[in-house]
Regions:
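Short glycine-enriched loops at secondary-structure junctions
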Residues: 91-93, 120-121, 183-184
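Short, acidic/small-residue loops that bind anionic groups at enzyme active sites
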Residues: 104-126, 134-141
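Conserved anion/nucleotide-ligand pocket segment
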Residues: 132-194
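N-terminal glycine-rich "phosphate-gripper" loop used for MgATP/nucleotide binding
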Residues: 85-96, 117
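Mature catalytic domains of secreted/periplasmic carbohydrate-active enzymes
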Residues: 9, 24, 102, 124-125, ...
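Short active-site oxyanion
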Residues: 83-85, 109-114, 175
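ATP/NTP phosphate-donor binding region
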Residues: 2-82
């Protein structure tokens, strides 16, 4: 059995790794800028230098680019060979708008791992279905939330972030890929080439 290893690459003894921050779903209000600055500083302290999509913040109508625009911004991050992780800081209802505009062959070849949650479940599962490449169901904004100290400690230690305690109600083991996430959003993929 091959164990999936995500490319976190966190170390205080090497130069910072490059990561992307994007929003494939609902954008944040402009008032979120200070929180983004705190997140970027936290990532910097964790050895990660970030570059941002131009579609993080909403306009006067609550939107930020079309599905095509947001997909193009995501693909630019996947194209950058220096980017190791792409953190989507959005969530809501609009992530499925990007699916038909993504180049899955280029995503497969990219060294970057996609991270997101909520309706980013659609992007995570589309990437897996179309490329076989794993993503991470995690909201990077947890690093600056109410449990920031705990989340940052887990983030620094890959074992704590990806290996956790559990009990089997029946049997003693299982194997295979884990898919899913937000079930409402996962079901949006039913009957599509992304399911």
């Amino acid at each position: 059995m091959t164990e999936m290893r995500c490319r976190i690459l966190i170390s205080q003894t090497v130069s910072p790794i490059k990561v992307g921050i994007t929003a494939c779903s609902n954008p944040h209000p402009v008032s979120f800028r200070p929180e983004l600055a705190v997140l970027q500083q936290t990532l910097r302290e964790l050895g990660q230098e970030s570059v941002c999509s131009p579609y993080l913040f909403s306009d006067e109508y609550g939107l930020s680019g079309s599905g095509t625009d947001r997909a193009d911004a995501l693909m630019q991050l996947f194209h950058d060979p220096e980017i190791r992780n792409i953190y989507d800081i959005s969530g809501g209802d609009m992530a499925n708008e990007v699916l038909i505009h993504l180049n899955y062959d280029e995503i497969r070849e990219s060294s970057a791992t996609f991270w997101g949650y909520s309706d980013l479940t659609t992007v995570i599962n589309a990437i897996y279905t179309r490329t076989g490449k794993p993503s991470v169901l995690y909201q990077i904004r947890n690093l600056t939330g109410d449990d920031a100290a705990l989340q940052q400690a887990r983030f620094r230690n890959e074992e704590e972030l990806f290996h956790f305690s559990y009990d089997f109600p029946q049997g003693t083991s299982m194997s295979g890929p884990v898919v899913g996430g937000n079930i409402r959003c996962f079901l949006k993929l039913a009957g599509t080439p992304y399911f």
